[in-house]
Regions:
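Domain-scale signature associated with acetyltransferase and cell-envelope carbohydrate enzymes
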Residues: 1-167
C-alpha cells in the first residue's frame, strides 16, 4: 500500500489496514501514494496521496485522509497563530487582541474594551505570551479522523481532530 513514495529524515508509519469510503461510494485503502515525507509521523490507517510537493515536520493522527494537496509543512519554530495581534473595533483605534487557541469571548471583550485597566491588560498579555512560547514548536500536528482534500499550501498550522479542509 506504499507506491511512488519518498522518505527523508525520520519517518514513522502506522499500520495500513483500513479502507475509507468517500462520497459517491468510492473505497480507498489506507496507504501512501505519490507523496514525499520528511520528518513525519503517520498514525494508523491513514491515506495520503497526490501531494504535489511534500509534507515536512508533522505528526499525523490516526484514520486521516489527505489527498491532492500542494504542500504541508512547518518550516521554523512557530506558535501556530498564538500571540498574534488582531485589530478589533477599528473605528475606536488601538484595540488589539492577542489571539490564542484558548481565547474566550469574555477575554477578548476585556482585552478590547478595558484599556482603562492597564495593569489587567498587561497581565493578560503576559499570560498569552507565556502560553504562546510554551506551545511553540518546530513540529505541527494533524489530528485523528481529519480529511484534507484539494488544498493548496498549509504552513505552520495545527489541525485538530475531526477537521475537514476542502479547497
Amino acid at each position: 500500500y506504499v507506491h511512488l513514495t519518498r522518505f527523508s529524515g525520520e519517518v514513522k508509519l502506522g499500520v495500513l489496514d483500513a479502507e475509507f469510503t468517500l462520497p459517491g461510494g468510492i473505497r480507498k485503502h489506507s496507504g501512501l501514494r505519490h507523496v514525499t515525507l520528511h520528518n513525519v509521523t503517520v498514525g494508523d490507517n491513514c491515506c495520503i496521496e497526490n501531494i504535489q510537493n511534500y509534507i515536512a515536520n508533522y505528526e499525523i493522527g490516526n484514520d486521516t485522509f489527505i489527498e491532492n494537496v500542494d504542500i504541508i509543512l512547518v518550516n521554523r519554530l512557530t506558535t501556530f497563530g498564538n500571540g498574534v495581534e488582531a485589530t478589533v473595533l477599528n473605528e475606536t483605534g488601538g484595540r488589539e487582541v492577542l489571539i490564542n487557541d484558548k481565547l474566550s469571548a469574555h477575554q477578548a471583550y476585556i482585552l478590547a474594551l478595558y484599556r482603562h485597566r492597564p495593569e489587567l491588560i498587561n497581565r493578560m498579555k503576559a499570560i498569552t505570551d507565556y502560553y504562546s512560547n510554551k506551545h511553540a514548536s518546530t513540529v505541527g500536528s494533524i489530528g485523528d479522523h481529519v480529511m484534507i482534500l484539494n488544498t493548496g499550501s498549509i504552513r505552520n498550522v495545527r489541525i485538530g481532530d475531526y477537521c475537514h479542509i476542502c479547497g
